[in-house]
Swiss-Prot record:
Signal peptide per UniProt: 1-23
Protein's recorded name: UPF0412 protein YaaI
Keyword Phosphoprotein on entry: no
Organism this protein belongs to: Salmonella agona (strain SL483)
Pfam families according to UniProt: DUF2541
Entry keyword annotation includes Signal: yes
Keywords: Signal
Gene: yaaI
UniProt family annotation: Belongs to the UPF0412 family.
Length: 134
C-alpha cells in the first residue's frame, strides 16, 4: 500500500513539473559576440523553422549598445520586421519582452534576427543572449 502511495505521489509530482515546464516555453535561441566597433550585420540564424512571438535580450560579460535590430521570416517574399530594442543593455541586465510576429493569423517562421551594435566599457567582447518565447 505504501509503495502505491509513493508511486502515485511521484506521478503527480512529475505531472506538475511537466505542466510548469510546458507553460514556460522560453528557449535560448543563441548568443552573439558583440565586437568593440559598431557593426550592423550581426546575424543570429535560426536553423529550424520556429515561430517566435517575442524575445528578450541579456547582456553577458560586458555592456552593449544597440542601434537597431530586425527579424526575418521564412516566406516566399523574405518578409522582415524592425524591432524596437533598447539603446543600451548593462552587463547582467535582461530587457523586457520585445514582441515580434504579432500577426496571429499568419504564423511565420523566424529564419534570422540581425542586430546593429557594439561592446562598450570592456576590453573583451560582450555577449548578447537572445531568448525566445513561442
Amino acid at each position: 500500500m505504501r509503495s502505491v502511495l509513493t508511486i502515485s505521489a511521484g506521478l503527480l509530482f512529475g505531472l506538475a513539473l511537466s505542466s510548469v515546464a510546458h507553460a514556460n516555453d522560453h528557449k535560448i535561441l543563441g548568443v552573439i559576440a558583440m565586437p568593440r566597433n559598431e557593426t550592423n550585420d550581426l546575424a543570429l540564424k535560426i536553423p529550424v523553422c520556429r515561430i517566435v512571438k517575442r524575445i528578450q535580450l541579456t547582456a553577458d560579460h560586458g555592456d552593449i549598445e544597440l542601434s537597431g535590430a530586425s527579424v526575418y521570416f521564412k516566406t516566399a517574399r523574405s518578409a522582415s520586421q524592425s524591432l524596437n530594442v533598447p539603446s543600451s543593455i548593462k552587463e547582467g541586465q535582461t530587457t523586457g519582452w520585445i514582441n515580434i510576429n504579432s500577426d496571429n493569423d499568419n504564423k511565420r517562421c523566424v529564419s534570422k534576427i540581425t542586430f546593429s551594435g557594439h561592446t562598450v566599457n570592456s576590453s573583451d567582447m560582450a555577449r548578447l543572449k537572445v531568448i525566445g518565447d513561442d
